[in-house]
Curated annotation (Swiss-Prot):
Location(s), subcellular: Cytoplasm
Identification of the protein by name: Polyamine aminopropyltransferase
Similarity comment: family membership: Belongs to the spermidine/spermine synthase family.
Pathway involvement of the protein, from the record: Amine and polyamine biosynthesis; spermidine biosynthesis; spermidine from putrescine: step 1/1
Active site per the UniProt annotation: 164 (proton acceptor)
NCBIfam families named in the record: PRK00811.1
Gene3D superfamilies the record matches: Spermidine synthase, tetramerisation domain, Vaccinia Virus protein VP39
Domain of life of the native organism: Archaea
Keywords: Cytoplasm, Polyamine biosynthesis, Spermidine biosynthesis, Transferase
Ranges where the PABS domain occurs: 5-245
Binding site for spermidine: 67, 91
Length: 291
């Protein structure tokens, strides 16, 4: 750890006109990998954080808001998720949440950047909580696009695909994984009642990028649900999109969600039955936008 001798801040661009300034207390990692700049730092307000190419990916104090909202709405909507594919999520928190579901027999996490995974194992224990040692977990260091094409050729099948990638507008690495063509490939990777969920960045600052992802999901899935969650360390509400071949996440009651969480032994800090119902009810301005 390197203590910061004076006032040092992360200046994160939220848009072309707005920035978020976050005070840094200590630096644990500053490294440029083959793909991106990696920083792991202790922040004043959000605790330890993983920062990629100047964007906070997750932080100790609010990561549960992000990861639980990404994982559990889709997982709970599926009646019995056994095989789960995670694209991205190198810090291990998405894998951690997926494996809370006792129905899961296999969770494959595919991340292109081995440095992110290895540095997270060492410096972000509160994120992964030892999940990499779970016998149900498989970690593959590979481009997600390449992995999916190989899995299709091999006839592999999944019940749930979780896309925990960098934003479609903040990095070049993941852009092709948000394309309509890629979502069509994911349909081929799913069982007949499969579900995907992706984080889709921020629709307030980047509506065109968000709409691109939304239209891509809608072009491949008969059931689509949108929701968003405010993440303090991001400085904005993150958008999520679910694409489902059968089950409708908006049809679940709070009681049904709680029943499935209890049956599967899932304990959470943010997500609940009432939270699920609230997430699936878009604000008026979002509903109007899609009329």
């Amino acid at each position: 750890m390197v203590s910061v001798p004076g006032p040092v801040s992360l200046i994160e661009p939220l848009s072309g006109n707005t920035i978020l300034v976050i005070k840094i207390n200590a630096l644990h990692v500053v490294k440029r990998s083959k793909y991106q700049e990696i920083i792991i730092a202790d922040t004043e307000d959000f605790g330890r954080a993983l920062i990629l190419d100047e964007y906070i990916q997750s932080s100790y104090y609010d990561e549960a808001y992000y990861h639980e909202s990404l994982v559990h709405p889709a997982m709970v909507t599926h009646i019995s998720p056994r095989d789960v594919l995670i694209l991205g999520g190198g810090e291990g928190a998405t894998l951690r949440e997926a494996l809370k579901h006792s129905t899961v027999k296999r969770a494959v996490m595919v991340d292109i950047d081995e440095d992110v995974v290895e540095l997270s194992k060492k410096y972000l224990p509160q994120m992964h909580q030892g999940v990499f040692e779970d016998p149900r977990a498989q970690v593959v260091i590979e481009d997600g696009f390449v992995y999916v094409e190989k899995a299709l050729k091999n006839g592999d099948k999944f019940d749930v695909v979780i896309m925990d990638l960098t934003d479609p507008y903040s990095s070049e690495i993941a852009k092709q994984l948000y394309s309509p063509e890629f979502f069509k490939k994911l349909v081929g990777l799913l069982r007949e009642d499969g579900i995907i969920v992706t984080q889709a960045g921020n629709s307030f600052f980047f509506p065109e990028a968000y709409d691109m992802v939304l239209h891509g999901v809608k072009s491949s899935f008969p059931v689509v649900a949108e929701y968003n969650v405010w993440i303090p360390s991001f400085g904005y509400a993150v958008n999520y999109i679910i694409g489902s071949l059968k089950y409708d996440p908006t049809s679940l009651t709070a009681e049904e969600v709680e029943k499935r969480l209890k049956e599967r032994g899932v304990k959470t800090l943010f997500y609940s039955g009432k939270t699920h119902v609230g997430l699936m009810n878009l604000p008026i301005y979002r509903k109007i936008r899609h009329v």
